[in-house]
Amino acid sequence: MSVIQLLHGTDHIIEVPDIHIGNPHNDYGMGFYCTRVDEMAREWACKKNTDGFVNSYDFDTEGLKVLNLLDGTHTVLNWMALLLQFRTFKLDSEVAVDARDYLIGHYSIDLTGFDVVIGYRADDSYFQYAESFVSNTLPLRSLNKALKLGKLGEQTVVISQKGFDHLHFINAYPVSRSVYYPKFLDRDTKARDTYRKEIKKSKSYRDDIFVLDILREEMSNDDPRIQRILFE
């Protein structure tokens, strides 16, 4: 048996999570979005500038099928493809539209049969990176670097009824907006500052890869040019 603790920060207590309550346009579609990092859960609880709660659960992963996008066998492009599949992007050019279709067609992963997804969390600041990559203004190296800023950007999402049945509520504790809303804003601001720096630096990356290069060269996940940048 492998039991881990999952935390869900929100504005109310959730003793029994419901698979039917959620947003189908979240990062990985409908599901229960959690973190294993207490500070992250506290920030989520107060992200609307209200007091909130961190709900704590024991989660038994025994017998569950887990897709771990961070285990080294997948790349940031797999994450991008799933994001493009579920989230609503601003596609204001033909390149962006073609990039969406190509990445979904060649890099997406069928979530059917999976109970849990572990991957990056595309909050507003991270989502800005993703949109810029699809629009061909941010290179792959900068996108990959941005998503490795720290574990606070990682999440565990329960996406099947079988997975929900493995969640066991422990307790919930209150979180003050006066403490954690400023922290939420500060982290977002730092991520945006890093984004601007990466955009500026990307102009000098002569050997980098932009999404248009991936389209023109029809690059796959195991292309040595992509591997060189992602694992340098």
Regions found by a protein language model. Give the residues of each.
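Conserved NAD+-utilizing ADP-ribose enzyme module
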Residues: 2, 48-52, 61-232
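Short, charged/polar surface micro-motifs in flexible loops or helix N-caps
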Residues: 13, 38-40, 62-65
